Structure formats: C-alpha cells, structure tokens
Amino acid sequence: MIEESRRPSLGDVRIGVLHHARSSLIRSGYMIGPMSDRWRARGAEVIDIIGTGTSVPLDVLLCHVDLSVVPEEYRRFAQNHPRVINLSATDIRKRSYLDDLVGIDDPYSGPVIVKSNLNHGGFPERLLEPRGSGLGRIANGILRRLRRRIGMVDEIRYKSDYVIHQERSSVPPVRFHDGSVIQPFRPERQDGNFVLREYYFLGDIEILNTEVGSDPVLTTGRQVECIQDSPPAEVRAIRDRLRLDYGKIDYGCPDGEVIVYDANKCVGTRSNPGEAVLKLAAVLSQGIDTWIESTPSS
C-alpha cells in the first residue's frame, strides 16, 4: 500500500484553487479538500478563488472548474498565472477520448452500457443552474418516476441512470441522438464481483487503486490494492490526449485488454472520506512539488 514520504516545507508558497463563480461545493466532496489540508500542513497558504473577478499573487494555480467543458474565461484567467495545473484540460466529454463508442448503424451486437457524454451524468452542470421552486423540483421528480414506471426513456441525470443492455439493438433509438454515448460493456470480473481500476495522478505522482464490488455501474467498492506505479500505456495515452496534469481515469482489464471507462479532472470523494482516501490524498498532494520546483511561464 502507498505511504506518504517526508517532503520539504512549503512555507511562503501560495497555492490558488480556481472554482466556478456559481459553485456551491468548494472542497466538500472533492479530493482537493484533503489535499489542501496536506499543503497547509507543510506550510503553504491555500486560497480558494471563486470566479474570475479577482486576481491575487500566486505561485501555483490549480484549475478546479467542475464542468465537462471549461468556459474560455476561466482558461484566460488561469493563463495569466506563472504556474497552472490543468490549464489545457478544457474538455472531458466522453466523445473526446473514448474510441470504442457504438453508433446506431454499427454491427456490434454484444452488451452495451448507455452513459451521459458529460462527466458524472451532467450533475456538475446542473448544480450551477438556477434553482427552481421546491414544488417545481418535487413535481419534476414525480414526473421522472412516472415516466420510468411506464417505460418511457428519460434523460440521464446521474451515474445511477446509466443502463446496461444485453444487445445494442435493445437500446432505444433516441439514446443515439440525445447526448448519450453507448459503449460496449466489457467489465473486468473477479470471483463474481466487478473490478474497477483507478489511475490517480498529480504531476509525477501516480497511484493505481483497485476496488471490487457487486455493482456494475457505480464506482464504489472494497479497496484491494493501492500502489504507486505507472498505468498501462493505453491509460496514459488518454491522460495525454486530455492534457490532464491532475485527475483520475477509470479503467478495467477484462481478459488482459485495457478498457477505459471514464476520466475526471475534479476528483470526487465522499463528504467524509475514510482513512484510505485520506492516505491517498496525502500521497497525491505531493505532486504539487512538480510545479513548485518548475520554472514559471513567461
């Protein structure tokens, strides 16, 4: 298992974390929360920057705008800083990096999983939408449940809405045109459970975490391994394509073949992370040294 190594003080270092102007979740539920705690423990000042209205002197800025497509104003704001993490990671929609997606006319006939093209079912985007009235939200929830009960296809709003079909032909045609993506369902299995491999990274710190669980869709399970190591070449290629300095990529290795499932640049956690997550965050946080020691951009 991974262990945090002793690192030098970050005294006098100012680290900024850039969030969307309407973000209601700053650190709770994100890996950046316990990582920031570790930076502070090493003496750094960590500053949350909400929106692009105010600029403060920083040594490093981490772009943490939790949208599948980052608005241009945030990239412009970020590039004015000397060292920027995830400056060029501006589009993580699944169509931008998954090469095995199935189209309506493709001959593929095996099991498929229907996902949202947006990260996490588009939930981060909806968090930034103006909130409707309480009665309106209740009515919309009831309508969604009724539509499902009578078999009508509804939009994918959460990861729990992802659906597995045993044949491509059983996918409702609307799913090929409504912002969904259809990927062959090729999970890695172990003793009847589903295996999820996670590649966490910040700079030159790379962590491979493996979980097993009974749910084929939701990515929470029992941790069976967590080591510092390099990922398979196919996984690193996705990181390079998305130009990610910090993030997480989910994948599996069914029958020895590497299959990428998902990528994220604003890594989430539970609101009260357990010891395993805190240890992972502590080791991952040390990747900030890559930027502290680098030459500032002109």
Can you name each region flagged by the protein language model?
Residues L127-P130, L202, Y261:
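Short beta-strand-to-turn element immediately C-terminal to the catalytic PLP-Schiff-base lysine
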Residues I2-G134:
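Conserved N-proximal alpha/beta basic substrate-recognition cap immediately N-terminal to
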Residues V69-E72, K94-R95, H120-P124, D191-N193, ...:
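Short catalytic/ligand-binding loop motif for oxyanion handling, primarily in non-cytosolic enzymes
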Residues L143-R239:
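Phosphate-binding site of ATP-dependent enzymes
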Residues Q183-F185, L208-V260, N264, G268-P296:
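A long amphipathic alpha-helix within ATP-dependent nucleotide-binding catalytic cores
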Residues V13, P107-V112, D178-S180, R197, F201-L202, C253, ...:
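Generic beta-strand structural signal
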